[in-house]
A protein has these predicted regions:
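Divalent metal-cofactor coordination and adjacent catalytic microenvironments
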Residues: 1-139
Length: 139
């Protein structure tokens, strides 16, 4: 879990100079971070990992918060969990376009198949996997 304020940050904001309550301050910071994640329904930290997705249709793939553009996208042509097709960046468009609002970088949440490409749609089966950095680009 990402702490949105370190123990040192909290102590500085409250002008606390001793370390008597560091464990309690850290616990409070951790609880506050968990509450923020739960309330917002997303995690603002980042993790680099491989994730699997089931397209709803051939044109648009909804994904978790994608923190950057350095990704590897692969798909399975026959729904057999063998990801035998590697997509190039020219094959899809990350959305929302211009993922920047109110002075903040926003994560990408969709990949649109472009040109003649279509996402392999197999009635709820995970036919796409993406290796990338997930979460919020910056907090």
């Amino acid at each position: 879990m990402t702490l949105y304020a370190s123990t040192a940050d909290i102590k500085a904001a409250l002008r606390i100079t001793d370390s008597v309550d560091d464990a309690l301050i850290n616990m409070a910071g951790s609880a506050a971070s968990s509450l923020i994640d739960g309330y917002c329904g997303r995690t603002f930290g980042t993790v680099s990992e491989l994730r699997y997705f089931a397209p709803d249709n051939g044109y648009l793939l909804q994904v978790d918060d994608l923190a950057g553009t350095a990704i590897t996208v692969e798909s399975s042509t026959v729904s057999d969990q063998v990801f035998d097709v590697t997509w190039e960046a020219k094959d899809y468009q990350l959305e929302p376009l211009n993922a920047y609002a109110d002075g903040l970088d926003w994560p990408y949440t969709r990949l649109r198949a472009i040109d003649t490409r279509l996402w392999p749609y197999a009635w709820g089966e995970a036919t796409v996997r993406i290796d990338g950095v997930w979460g919020w680009p910056a907090i």
